C-alpha cells in the first residue's frame, strides 16, 4: 500500500483536506471522487500505478476530512470553484492531469471546458452527466427541495466498521473483505457512543432544486481542449438508471473533440475498486501517449 499524507488548505472559507501520495518532481495527477465518497477511495488505483506520479485527491466540501459547507444544502457550481482555487494552490498556472469518478468526472469535464488551459489531459470514469430534464419538472423539483430542507436527512448508524464493510460488500460483491474494511474505515467515523456513521454531511442527500440543463453542460464539454479518456464499466447500470439509452450515451461522448473511449470488463460503476489494475493500465497508457 502506497502511503498517503494529509494536507489542509483554506479554500473559499473552508478547511479543505487533500490527500497526497507524494512523488516530488513527478507529473501531477489530481483525482476527484464521487458523491458520498472520499479521497481514500482511490487508494487501490494509486497502488496499481506503475509510473511515478505526484498524486493529489481532495475530499470535496462536506465529505471526509474537509469541513462541511455553511449552507443547509450543496450546490454543484461550488465544486467547480473549489477545484479552481485548489489547482491554483497546487500548481499555480500549470496544467495538470485531471481524473474524476462519477460526480468528480462531471466536475472535471465541466471545469476542463471552462478553464481549458488548466487541464493537460482529462480522464472521466463513469461521469456522464444526469438525466435530461424538462422545464415542466421545475415546480415538483422545487417542492421536493423545500420538503427535504424541512425534513433534514440523516445517516443510519452502524454498530461497527465491520457492519459498514458488510454493507459495502453487499452493494458491490466484487469488493474483497480487505478492501471493504479499508473503505469502511475511511468512509465512516466512530462516535462517542461507539456507533459508526458515514463521514460526511447528510445535507448532500438533499435534491438540487435547479434542474440539470444538458444543453449548458454540452456547451462546456465542447470547449474542452485536452485529450479525453472516457472509461466505463462493462457491468455498470448507472447510465441506464438515468434513463439514457445507448444512442444518448454515444451522443454525450461525441461532444468531446479529442476523445478515446474504453470499457473495463468485469467492472461496474465503482470500476476503480473492481478493476484498479486495468483502470491504471488504461490511464497510464493514455497519459504517456
Locations of the language-model features?
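Catalytic histidine-centered segment of alpha/beta-hydrolase-like enzymes
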Residues: 264-276
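Conserved HGGG/HGGXW glycine-rich cap/lid loop of the alpha/beta-hydrolase fold
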Residues: 17-68
Amino acid at each position: 500500500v502506497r502511503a498517503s499524507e494529509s494536507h489542509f488548505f483554506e479554500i473559499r472559507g473552508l478547511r479543505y483536506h487533500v490527500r497526497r501520495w507524494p512523488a516530488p518532481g513527478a507529473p501531477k495527477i489530481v483525482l476527484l471522487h464521487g458523491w458520498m465518497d472520499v479521497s481514500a477511495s482511490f487508494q487501490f488505483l494509486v497502488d496499481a500505478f506503475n509510473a511515478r506520479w505526484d498524486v493529489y485527491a481532495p475530499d470535496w466540501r462536506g465529505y471526509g476530512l474537509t469541513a462541511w459547507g455553511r449552507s443547509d444544502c450543496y450546490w454543484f457550481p461550488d465544486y467547480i470553484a473549489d477545484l479552481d482555487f485548489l489547482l491554483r494552490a497546487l500548481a499555480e498556472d500549470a496544467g495538470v492531469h485531471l481524473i474524476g469518478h462519477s460526480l468528480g468526472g462531471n466536475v472535471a469535464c465541466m471545469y476542463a471546458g471552462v478553464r481549458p488551459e488548466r487541464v493537460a489531459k482529462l480522464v472521466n470514469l463513469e461521469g456522464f452527466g444526469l438525466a435530461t430534464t424538462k422545464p415542466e419538472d421545475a415546480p415538483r423539483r422545487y417542492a421536493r427541495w423545500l420538503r427535504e430542507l424541512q425534513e433534514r436527512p440523516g445517516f443510519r448508524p452502524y454498530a461497527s466498521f465491520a457492519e459498514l464493510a458488510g454493507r459495502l460488500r453487499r452493494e458491490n460483491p466484487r469488493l474483497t473483505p480487505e478492501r471493504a474494511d479499508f473503505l469502511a474505515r475511511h468512509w465512516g467515523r466512530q462516535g462517542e457512543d461507539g456507533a459508526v456513521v458515514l463521514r460526511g454531511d447528510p445535507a448532500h442527500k438533499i435534491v438540487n432544486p435547479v434542474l440539470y440543463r444538458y444543453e449548458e453542460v454540452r456547451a462546456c464539454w465542447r470547449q474542452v481542449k485536452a485529450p479525453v479518456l472516457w472509461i466505463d464499466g462493462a457491468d455498470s447500470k448507472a447510465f441506464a438508471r438515468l434513463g439514457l439509452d445507448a444512442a444518448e450515451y454515444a451522443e454525450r461522448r461525441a461532444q468531446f473533440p479529442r476523445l478515446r473511449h474504453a470499457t473495463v470488463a468485469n467492472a461496474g460503476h465503482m470500476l476503480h475498486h473492481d478493476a484498479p489494475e486495468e483502470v491504471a493500465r488504461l490511464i497510464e497508457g493514455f497519459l504517456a501517449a
